[in-house]
Amino acid sequence: MERQVHPHASMLTLQFPLVGCRFCLHRLVWKWIKRVMTCSLATLLCAAEPQLLQPVGGTQDGGLARVLSVMDKEAIERFEPDTEVVFHMFNDLLRAYTHQDNVKDAWNVFIKPEDIVGIKVLSDPGSVSGTRPAVVEAVIKSLLSVGFSGRQIIIWDRRKGLLVATGYDQLAKRLGVSIAGSVDYGFDQAVYYEAPLVGNLVFGDHEFGRDEPGIGRKSYVSKLLTQKLTRVIQIHPMLNHYLGGVNGHVVGLATGGVDNSLRFTLDEDRYHEAIPEICAIPALYDKLAFSLVDALISQYQGEERGFLQYSTVLGELRISKDPVALDVLSMMEINRQRNQSGLKRHRSAFQLYRNAELLQLGVSDPSNILFERIR
């Protein structure tokens, strides 16, 4: 395949040291960053959409992010995935991404035999618009097929009850794995993100019901991540999000891994700063094996509610070690669909991914993303 890199505006490269578990970049720094940026990332991404969404070859090289895609028109029929087709799609994608001839060697690139693997899903929107159980089943069956123990696999999201409502408890029982809610697992008092923004604590938050000075300023990381899981695989759908642009991997890992995150939704700028900073906590980001986009169906309107009338069947899966690049490409596709439907594009949310790149979480500049479709 021919390799293409899209020559748009150059990338501003800034690095920030991450110290401990308090990743609070001062607002003055962010304002300075925004002033010195010479181009609008939103404009850049909108301009790059038509070319970047075409099949492109490429390999990970230097500061470039590598994203692989597989499509199959037989993967979904009347909004129902074909589990066998999806299983083969994933295995083909995994082998191609790792440049391995067999599935076992491909998994060995990411997972060690002793790892406890957490598969992060989005269950709030249900099994049609959220992470589809057929995709999760494909990943788990692939792991089991190479001898990995089901006792070392946990399907997780914020709340166990939502996993049950979406049918993940039955899937877990059938495959011999388990499910867990990060909120239900409890929170680690020693690992947290602190910001001087106080919101209303809700039931399930670690400090809920307490009335002391300083309460509500910390977002604690779940013990599921600090004490149980050693590797995380994220599987999120291509679903729009009104603050984050896409309910993808950066937003999903940050909001799924900590409590007291609703306070950031009150201010767009603060949300765009806090979400990448939370995602950068080592107990979250450092455990990522890879991220997978469930793009069997793309929903461009509705956020956590399922609206098939605002959905497009793509029959596609995408994989990368770079969650930021995946989210940027998903946002671009969602914006393309919104534009075709006469809806306003998400523009301001691109700042979230620019901030994530400044924290070295991934690549947000489309000229540094190599996108390859294997079929």
Task: Give, region by region, the residue ranges found by the protein language model.
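N-terminal secretory signal peptides that target proteins for export/translocation
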Residues: 1-31
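Residue-level detector of bioactive/disordered segments in secreted/extracellular proteins
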Residues: 23-26, 41, 48
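Bacterial N-terminal signal peptides
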Residues: 34-44
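Hydrophobic alpha-helical membrane context
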Residues: 43-46, 339
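Extended, low-polarity segments enriched in aliphatic/aromatic residues
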Residues: 50-113, 126, 130-137, 144-375
